[in-house]
């Protein structure tokens, strides 16, 4: 029985990156032998065991055979005579098909070390095309390793996989899982670019794909292209280390611009309402978590008016705060402001160092929350008038704030 560290642990160590988890391949063993050594079985589809001391995963060397469409149609074969090279051959990219033995010697039958040095994502074998999830994985790796490029032959294979309908068999949960992981990488825009380059974005997220090439007014968007603007906004969210809900919201905030009538371009009147509807549809189709869905819908609907805090009437500001449930959910409203700030900062040309509307909205929210709704309700004889009285008091509080505004700070 021989054991080897494989995959991401070897790759990251060679790149000088921290190694969080180690996966092992075991050659020359049977499940019974693993059990006799105290390993605990955890694999459902193929033999995977946890080491009795380290709890690290040890998988018996195996080969794979395609049996159907999509990512689930595989048959696995494990036996003591399956070699390490055969196990590595089933992996997606050469940089993930490197093993290290107990002495530290690298086993690299497919040129992964050379591709690490060349900063290239290259598929190990034509079997790459058997699993459409690999398209999403390559795109996610592009978001993590920003200085890598996809080998031309690998990109061509990915395009062929899209053309033959393999990606259409991906289940929503798996698409969301890979999208979410990619969005949380350092450069999520690169994930979107790779998916677009191979044609997968048009199949998986057509609402986003159609934004590319749609013009916007140069006065507000020097970058012109709506798709490019969205990627700049997502990059702003990543640069500020925002949470997944904020990053998802920035990705979907302008979807409605893809449905703007051509006759009114480059203007996009009413795109916020269209964007909110599409953000909900996309989030539900991909089965995104509720917090991601709700924030995306609200940011899409409100990002335009949030940017206008300086010119809004007190009445309008209070209506927005009430509509966003900001009094009960101030933390979520703060996330909306963060996403709206990314929208403002994620564009071409010169940008101010901070986004002033954030401080204006937070000050207005504080003023509204200072209104004692309970006291107003107790003092009002006509209970039917209580909501209007409370609303009027909130408007008065914001008007008073406008008369003596706090120092402008904003989100930098």
From Swiss-Prot:
One of its GO terms (biological process) is RNA repair. Its cofactor is Mg(2+); Ni(2+). One of its GO terms (molecular function) is CCA tRNA nucleotidyltransferase activity. PROSITE patterns: HD. ATP binds at residues 8, 11, 91, 137, 140. PANTHER family: MULTIFUNCTIONAL CCA PROTEIN. Belongs to the tRNA nucleotidyltransferase/poly(A) polymerase family. Bacterial CCA-adding enzyme type 1 subfamily. This is Multifunctional CCA protein. It comes from Azoarcus sp. (strain BH72).
